[in-house]
Amino acid sequence: MPELPEVEAVVQTLRPLVQGQRIRCVHVFHAIAVKPQLAGRLTELATNSCIQRVERKGKYVLLMLDYGLLTLHFKLDGQVVWFVDQKELFERANSKENGVHVDVAFELSKGVLGFADRRHFGRVYAWESLEDSPGVASIGVDALSKDFTAATFQKLLAASVRPLKDFLLDQTRVAGLGNIYSCESLWHARLDPRRRAKSLNHEESRRLHKAIVSVLRRALECCLHPAPDFRDSQWWFQGLKRILRAYDREGEPCRRCGVAIRRIEQGGRSTYWCRRCQK
């Protein structure tokens, strides 16, 4: 699932492609991508609107229009796909060999911006304002923003009795972390993912804060170099494999102490950690 670094890389790559362009036409190929909204709402708000800015909030891509906005949420497998023109859109959308599962497409002044998801979990919504979007409006402090200070983070930790891993996944507390970077941050901070958030002392809290920022920044660099390939659904994961220290490394020796990385289940998700290093 794309997390903060991947979504930020998409935003930075999209800006020069779509910013300032007008949406000429909207194609909704699979209505499930806009539910519970109606396809007509998306079409009505977006058609003939100009994309003023491309921004990010947590794991959401925001296309700020001259009136209203569009939110793109990738969920597990959603991705942005770029087409040269309408002809390529329909050719690739209908191709069995090199096809993509396009749910929604926006024909722009130059090029076509598509939103694809083979599982149809991702969502594209139209809103008149940010406050109208319950998902975006409830998001907590962004993990790469200047507001995410060590002091702010410590206060959030102190107010929660949840296990650290579950706390980090709560987007209403800290926005942007998912399963991958929560595991990685806890490994770098040498903290047991099962510990209660409020149990961390001052030094441990600062260590985790530093690890989160460092892990996300390094991952973002990997996502941007080379630049995102909007034709490869797994572009974001390829470069990350070389920097991951815990995630998806069950049974492999810990890069610090040599003890095998373990996998446990927390909140229905896999957590990877070192039982010797992480206390």
Can you annotate each of these PLM segments?
Residues M1-V124:
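Gly/Gly-Pro- and Ser/Thr-rich, intrinsically disordered tail segments characteristic of DNA damage-repair
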Residues P5, A9-Q12, A151, K155, ...:
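Short, contiguous clusters of charged residues that form electrostatic/catalytic patches at enzyme active sites
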Residues R22-L42, E55, F90, Q154-K279:
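Basic, nucleic-acid-binding surfaces and adjacent catalytic neighborhoods in DNA/RNA-processing proteins
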Residues L70-G176, Y181-H188, R196:
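Phosphate/anion-contacting hairpin/loop surfaces
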Residues M1-L4, A143, D147, N201-H209:
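Generic detection of long, well-ordered alpha-helical segments
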